[in-house]
Each structure stands twice: as structure tokens, then as C-alpha cells.
Amino acid sequence: MGFDIDSQKICSDLESSDRRLKTTVLDELLDKCKEATNSESADKIADVFDKLYLHLLKCYEDRFESVRSKAIQVVSAFLSSLPPTDFHLMNVVSTLAERMGKAETVEPSEEIRLLYIAQLNLMICLYEKMENVGVFRECYPLVVKILIKSIKDDYPVVQREGCSAVVTLSRLADTQEFRPFTESILLPLYTMLNHKHAQARISAIQAIARLSLHMDASGDAMRRLFNEVSPLLMDTMPLVRREVGQMGILMLMELLDRYSFFERILPLVLCCLKDESPEVLNHIYPQWLKCGIQYFNENEAELSQQEISDLPVENYPKDVKRPTIGCRGLVQRSLRLLQLITRETSDWKDNVRLHALKLLYQFVLHAEAAMTAKFFEIYGDLAHACIDHVAEVNAEAAKVADLMGRLLSYDAWIDHGFDGLERNARESYMRCFYHMFTASLGGTYEQLMRLAKLLRCTDYSHTLKPGFQHYILKLLNTIVDKTLKINAGQNELEDLYESVYVCAIKVMALSSSLENVGDEDVNFGQTLIEKMVKLLNTSVPKIHERWFHLALQDVINLDAALEDNAEPVMLLNGLINMCHIRATYVHDLIEKVKIVFQHCCDSAQVKIFSSLSLATLFWSKTMNVERESSTQMLSEFVSQIVEPYLTWKAGSNAEAMRSLAMATLCALAQGAESESVEVLPSLAKYMPSLLEDRNVTTRHYAIKAVVYFREMSVEDLKPLAYATMQRMDDPSAGIRILAALAMGKLKPKFAETDTEENYEKEVWDAIVKRAMDLLLLYHESPEKDMRAAVAVTLKVLAKSHPEAWEERYQRALPMAQKKDLLTELYDKLTINEDSHTEVTSASQD
């Protein structure tokens, strides 16, 4: 079908006030135009459009929305069918500017505003095909007004179409001609960066990226551009972050003055290389390699020489691909940005700190040893980031420190690292140094010794911070591991291990004394000591005996009114709990404890005494000396630590100390059973009063200790026996039962001469009879446990004193309230005795 129309009739119909007529005409015209695209010549279509375009453009202002919409579609159809020409350009653009380029919103319909900006985009694309046709530049003021209005539109689709038009225009515009308009377009685009729709933010970034290639780089506009776009590197949507990286790639490849802005462009790309989303990394990384190739080609003379001597890094991190020499060169010329990056690691926003550390990681990865000179500048900020309260942030800081330890020149940074530790005895510097030092391959004997001595000093090893303690132990473990790779004599290694041991045992002691802290650090320290034991070919007890006294010497400032939570008290308490009491340092330990008892507060005294009482349970296991020496040391310990507190004194603290002294004595009797036989008799004079003490705990430990008073004469044991019998009437049921059991375990040592022996036996028989009377009395007790304890003791006494048992039974039987129970007990004990006699006779036969 031909494109034959009655142009005059169409023009007349378009001027009609009948909406239906105009829409019908426009529909027919649109259909014919679409059909003519493939069947009619361009000249024919152009001839028709020349006759109609003024009336069509006039319809843009029609009061009916449907007419305006159809008119725009018809004009766009004609423009699409026509060859590239600027004949109608000014008229169409002017009309669009009237409808879309004013400050106020002239066109109320969102859909028609979208058609307007789509038509402008179409015309820009057509202009691109016209190559060097200069009429369009005359339209820049009008076009820019339309674009700005579209970007500010409330309708997101219109905004995105406007951004698309900006991108298209930026691709074909001449920089010198278009530059005056860039800043006015950028302003609404910056506002659009905060749009709630991710797709709108992406469109804005694309437009800004293209406009940046035309900007005047000499002013503040470029600085503002980076400030506005950079926050989107932390956008929640991966596609937005990817677009920011794409903008960086575009500027690295095409920006004329890119060398001046490498420091600001690189973060846009490097952050995407550390992005957690694969779709960001996989899109940006190949293009980043192209940037490196371009930079290498532009600086081939310099980089080719560097490439020749570019050896593989020995300690490169696993699963990390080394950047190309071109990419590394790009970053190495932009190290001035590090100060800005490290400053952001202290920002109040969590995501900003994390973003800065990820960026710093990429800088270290690309700069490698060239970054060594900047280490001292960023050491403090990175150290602070290592103790960030957000786990994800401090984990990223640890990765950066690890990478720095691997890639930076060890000999150049190690002295700065030590200097930071010496000046700043804080957990932050410790963590940072640990990650760097552990990851590095360096470490001489002198450096390891210097580090071990530094950690041994009170500023480090006496800390009460659990996190600090943990990293001290980890750094000590690193020192031990690195000793396997150094050249040092056995004596030198032993000196080094000595410092490591002393530091480790102090940290473990303090860690064990802290409340609400697990055993993780203590267990880790034990593993560390066991590792040293293997290297020294010795045992854990021997290493304690050899070096523990050095740790004890570091417990200072005890001569003050310290509470139980004071660091010196906690250290001494932890040391006692960790290693107990050993022969090599028992004298030093006694002196330290005496100072505590003399000067420290009540709570501190009680705490130390409690630990001592537990430690004495292991006396026979930890005292690796002959029995005679062990007995002598036990006697000294008891006389100086325990005995002074067995006598009664007024006051709550004195009462607590008396209880603990009795507990310690009881523990010693169990832990040093053979040695206590010789030591305890001298303390028998205190026992009667202790057995009658007002404090139930004191009486409890006293009655438990009574049975360990052995090898004593009848005269010395007699007061203990009667005091023990009195405890069978104690208010505490537990003490009554223990007293009943204790009477069967008291064994005197009789005199060697017959006369004295007979006399002492008579005295002891009287004591036994008295005990039997009491036991028979308590056998009628309603307490089941008490009756059982009485039966056990009577069985022992009846066996050793049968005549006395028979006599006391006959005496008690008439007075017994429950004769059947007493008779049953008598029969049971007598049967046992008879059966025992028969078995003995049979064995003799």
C-alpha cells in the first residue's frame, strides 16, 4: 500500500476540537508510517513529514492526553523512518523543551513524559549516525534542560530514561562543546544516587561515569564526584557496587587526565576486587586486568625493566592470585592514598571501617614490598582496627596484618614493629604485630630473644585483659615455632625458652585467677609448655622446678594493703594453683606468703591460704626429693605458715584464717602422709581447742585431721581422744559421724619398757572403755548414719580390746532402751570375732 495521504485534510482534522477524530487520524497515520518504513523511499516519507510535522508538534500541547500520546508516537515513528538529518531537529527539541524543560511541570502525565524523554533519546541516537553534523550542538542548552527535568522527575522510569539519554549524549558529544553543561547535569544525578530503587541508582552511576570523561578536572567538581559516588561502594545491592567498579574501570581506561586521579579512581575498582559477591568480582576482575595491560603498555620502558627482576614472592598467601605487574604498577604509584584509607578505619560507622580495611588489603596485595615505607604511618591505625568491637572488622584487620607480614620487607619493618610494641604496651599493637610476625619468614635469635624479654616484662605478662593474655600466649607459641628455623646454640635456646616459660606461666596464672573466664588460655599455655618440654628433652615437673622460681621473683609490691583482686595477689594465687609447691622454690614461696599475711587485706590473705590448702594435697607428688628433705621442708612450711594461725584470735578474719590453717593441715596430712607422721605431733597441743572451735568448718577439718596424728605417746594422744569423744555430741551431724569413726583409728605408740608399757596400756584401756560407753550410748541414736559409724568403730575396738568390749556390753545392757538392737550388735560383732578366730586357727594348723 502506498503512502498516499491527503495532508490538507489531516492537518484540518488535527486542528479540530473533536478528540475522537484526532485520535483516529493519528492512529491511521501511525499505521501508515510503520507500513511505509519498508515499502516507501525515505524521500517520500520525508516529504510527507515536511507537510505534517508542524501540526503534529502542535498536538503536543493538546488538552487531551490520548491526542498528545498519539502525536508523540507518530513523530517518533517518522523520525525512526527518516535518514539521519537535522532538518527538523530544532523544531522538535524546542517543542520538547516547552513541554519538558521548564522549572514547573507542564506535562501532568507520567507516561507522556516518558514518551518525551524517549523521543529525545531517539533523536540523540539519530544524531550519532550523522557523524560530524554540528546543528545539534546548538540544541545543547535545550537538551540539557530536558535531561535535568527528566532526572528530577518523580517517576523512576522517566529518571532512568533520562539517565540513558545522558549516557548516549555523553558518548557522542565533543568534550570541549559539552563540558560547560556537565556540572549542571551532575547535580540532580547526585541526588538520584540516594534513590530507594537500586535500578535508579545504577542508571545514575552510569550517567555520572560518562559525564566524568567530559568534566573539567582542574576544579573541585571532580573531587565532589568521587565523594558522592564512593559511599555506594558499601551499597547493599551487589549490582550497584558493580556499577561503581565499572565507573572506575571506565575512568582508568578513558579519562584523559586519569594519571592525576589514579589515587581517587583506584578505590572504586579495588573495593570490587574484595567484594563478597561473585557477580561483582567476576565482572570487574577481567576488566581490571585490561587496565593493567594498558598501563603497562603506556609505561613499558619502566615496567619492562621491573618485570625482568620480578621474582615470585616466597611467602605468598595460598589461594590468592598475584596481580599482574601492570596492575601492581598502577597501585604502587598511588600510595599517598593510604593515609586517607587508614583514617577511615577509625570511622564511627561499622561498614565504613570494614570497607576501608578491604580496600587496604587490596593496596597491600598490589603494592607488596613497595608499601614497606608506609608501614610506620599505618601501624597505629591498623593496630586499633585489630581490636575493633565488631568481629568482622577485626577479622579483616587481621587479614591485612597477615598479608603485610608476608609481602612487606621484613628487615625494613621489624624494627618499627618492635618500637611500636615497646612504646605501646597495648593489646592493639600486640595483635597487629602477632599477625605480621607469625606470617613472616623472618626472625633471628636476637629478635626472638628481644621479643621474649619484652613480653616477659610486667607491662605485658602482668595484664589482666583476657584478649591480651590470649595473644601473648599465641605470640610466645610463634617464638617457639620460629626457634626451629634459627641457628643458635643449646645454651642460647635454653635462655630463650626460659623467658618464654616465665612469661607463659605468669599469663596462665593470671588467666586462671580471673573470674568468668574459661580455661582456653590455660590449656593453650599448657600445650606451649609441653612443646618446650619436648624440645628440651625434659619433663613438665622438671621445667617447673628449674624456672618457676623466676616467675615467683616477679611477684612484687605485695607489701601493701591489697585486695584479693589486685594483680600481685592474683598472680601469686594463680602461680600456686598452676604449679603447687615444689622443693626448688618452697622457701621463696613461704617468704611471699608471709608478706601477704603481714600486709595484704583480709580477702587477699584468705584467697592465698585457700590456694595453699589445695596445693598441699599434692605435696608427695610435687616434692621430688628424699623423704628426709621433704619432712624438713614440711616442718618449715607448717611452722611458718600454718602454726601461727592455729591459736584462737578474735575477729572474723582470724576465724577464717584459723579455718584455712586447719584445712591446710588436714590437706598436708593427706598429701604428705608419711612426712606428716613426724610433723603433726608437735601440733597436737592446738587440737583440743580447735576441736571445740565455734566455727563448724574449723571443727570439721580438725576432726578429719585427728586420725593422722600417729606415733604419739598415750599421754600426748589422751587430750585428742577425749576431745574427739566430745565431738560425738557436736551440733553438726557430719562432725558427730566423723568423731565416731575417728575413735577407732586413734593408735598410740606405747613405751618400750615393760613397766611404762603396762601403765600406758591401762590408761589407754580406760580411754577405750570410755569411748565404748559413749559409742553404745549413740548406738541408740535415731540417725541411721550415726549408728552405722558407731558399729564400724565398735567392731574395730572390740577386735583390739575384746575383754573391755565384753565388760562394757554387760554394763550397758541393763541400761539400754533398745536392748534388741544392742543384743543384735553384740551378736554380730561376737560372731565376726569368733569366725575370725576360727579362720586364724585353721590357717595355723
From Swiss-Prot:
| HEAT repeat residue intervals | 47-84, 138-175, 180-217, 260-297, 332-369, 523-561, 674-715, 766-803
Q: What does this protein do?
A: Cytoplasmic protein involved in the delivery of the dynein machinery to the motile cilium. It is required for the assembly of the axonemal dynein inner and outer arms, two structures attached to the peripheral outer doublet A microtubule of the axoneme, that play a crucial role in cilium motility.
**What does the entry state regarding organ or tissue expression?**
Expressed in testis.
Name where it mostly resides.
cytoplasm
Endpoints of the signal sequence = none
Q: What is the lineage of its organism?
A: Eukaryota, Metazoa, Ecdysozoa, Arthropoda, Hexapoda
Q: Which Gene3D superfamilies match?
A: Leucine-rich Repeat Variant
Molecular functions (GO terms): dynein intermediate chain binding
Entries under PANTHER family matching the protein = DYNEIN ASSEMBLY FACTOR 5, AXONEMAL, DYNEIN AXONEMAL ASSEMBLY FACTOR 5
One GO cellular component term of this record is:
cytoplasm
Observed phenotype of the null mutant: Homozygous deletion-mutant flies are not viable. The larvae are smaller but do not display obvious morphological phenotype. RNAi-mediated knockdown in sensory neurons affects flies movement coordination and impairs hearing. Testis-specific RNAi-mediated knockdown does not alter spermatogenesis and in particular the formation of sperm axonemes but it impairs sperm motility.
Compartments annotated for it: namely: Cytoplasm; Dynein axonemal particle
Similarity comment: family membership = Belongs to the DNAAF5 family.
Keywords annotated in UniProt: Cilium biogenesis/degradation, Cytoplasm, Repeat
Which GO terms are recorded in the biological process aspect for this UniProt protein? adult locomotory behavior; cilium movement; cilium movement involved in cell motility; flagellated sperm motility; inner dynein arm assembly; outer dynein arm assembly; sensory perception of sound
Q: What is this protein called?
A: Dynein axonemal assembly factor 5
